[in-house]
């Protein structure tokens, strides 16, 4: 069996790091045979912090025996220059795209930290925080209160990716995303939980290949009926049958990234 290639990746930002991480992930997913160790360095706003980041990056490179990869979204040219002195392969989104965009638009950018997320007082920021809180409070069917406020309600059997997808929708798009598990009792009744019936237009289903679900569940609860391949096949077949019968839009998440799943949901439910 070939040895898996391992590389360390740093995401360095003067803000939360969500933007640079999302951009980096979109590139990293193109290299399926490499195992990436990911380290985030957010809120880098001073020379001292930049120097500390360089020391950390260099130390990691010495430990790995291979230089790290560094993705940055540092607006301040001085801080960006310091980080680029690290013994690493550095990719700056602002250095790569901002200058050509300034040339095309014929105007200099503001070089203002945090413009992509807005200030803490902005309505967009508040909306995103509210969405994250709502999503956490409505994870895995914890409660069915206030479902009328949801932008989307994900349904699937356990371990199909409902929670990470819900959080991604909340964090990246400011959507209130609830999610509910489909359980054996639902299959016995042959219909959706009653609390979801009146919110049918907001429902979106996730499914997965039974073999992949078996692998995931074995890591959580090995040698159990819950994780058995036979049970995984049964649950997936019943869930897909129910979603077809109820007219719920759904997709197979087996080989898709959270970004791809989320984009499909946005398009199918016309949320963007």
UniProtKB/Swiss-Prot annotation:
GO terms assigned for molecular function: ADP binding; ATP binding; phosphotransferase activity, phosphate group as acceptor; protein serine/threonine kinase activity
UniProt xrefs under InterPro entries: Kinase-pyrophosphorylase (IPR005177), PSRP (IPR026530)
PANTHER family: PYRUVATE, PHOSPHATE DIKINASE REGULATORY PROTEIN 1, CHLOROPLASTIC
Top EC class of this enzyme: transferase
Binding site for ADP: 156-163
Function: Bifunctional serine/threonine kinase and phosphorylase involved in the regulation of the phosphoenolpyruvate synthase (PEPS) by catalyzing its phosphorylation/dephosphorylation.
HAMAP family, per database record: PSRP (MF_01062)
Lineage, highest ranks first: Bacteria, Pseudomonadati, Pseudomonadota, Betaproteobacteria, Rhodocyclales
Source taxon at top rank: Bacteria
Record's keyword terms, sorted: Kinase, Nucleotide-binding, Serine/threonine-protein kinase, Transferase
Protein family: Belongs to the pyruvate, phosphate/water dikinase regulatory protein family. PSRP subfamily.
Source organism of the structure: Dechloromonas aromatica (strain RCB)
Entry EC number(s): 2.7.11.33, 2.7.4.28
Protein's name according to its UniProt entry: Putative phosphoenolpyruvate synthase regulatory protein
Catalytic activity field: [pyruvate, water dikinase] + ADP = [pyruvate, water dikinase]-phosphate + AMP + H(+); [pyruvate, water dikinase]-phosphate + phosphate + H(+) = [pyruvate, water dikinase] + diphosphate
């Amino acid at each position: 069996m070939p040895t898996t290639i391992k590389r360390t990746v740093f995401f360095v930002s003067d803000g939360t790091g969500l933007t640079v991480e999302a951009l980096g992930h979109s590139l990293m997913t193109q290299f399926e045979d490499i195992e990436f160790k990911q380290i985030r360095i957010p809120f880098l706003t001073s020379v001292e912090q930049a120097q500390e980041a360089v020391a950390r990056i260099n130390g990691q490179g010495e430990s790995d025996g291979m230089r790290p990869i560094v993705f940055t979204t540092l607006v301040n040219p001085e801080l960006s220059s310091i980080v680029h002195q690290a013994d690493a392969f550095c990719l700056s989104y602002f250095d790569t795209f901002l200058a050509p965009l300034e040339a095309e638009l014929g105007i200099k950018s503001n070089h203002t930290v945090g413009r992509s997320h807005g200030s803490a007082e902005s309505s967009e920021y508040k909306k995103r925080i509210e969405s994250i809180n709502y999503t956490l409070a409505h994870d895995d069917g914890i409660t069915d209160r206030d479902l009328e406020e949801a932008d989307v309600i994900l349904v699937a059997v356990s371990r199909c990716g409902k929670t990470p997808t819900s959080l991604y929708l909340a964090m990246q798009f400011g959507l209130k995303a609830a999610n509910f598990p489909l359980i054996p009792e639902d299959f016995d009744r042959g219909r959706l939980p009653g609390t979801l019936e009146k919110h049918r237009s907001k429902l979106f289903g996730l499914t997965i290949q039974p073999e992949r679900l078996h692998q995931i569940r074995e890591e959580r609860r090995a040698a159990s009926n819950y994780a058995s391949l036979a049970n995984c096949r049964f649950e997936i077949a019943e869930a897909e049958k129910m979603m077809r019968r109820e007219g719920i839009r759904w997709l197979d998440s087996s080989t898709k990234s959270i970004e791809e799943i989320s984009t499909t949901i946005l398009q199918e439910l016309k949320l963007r």
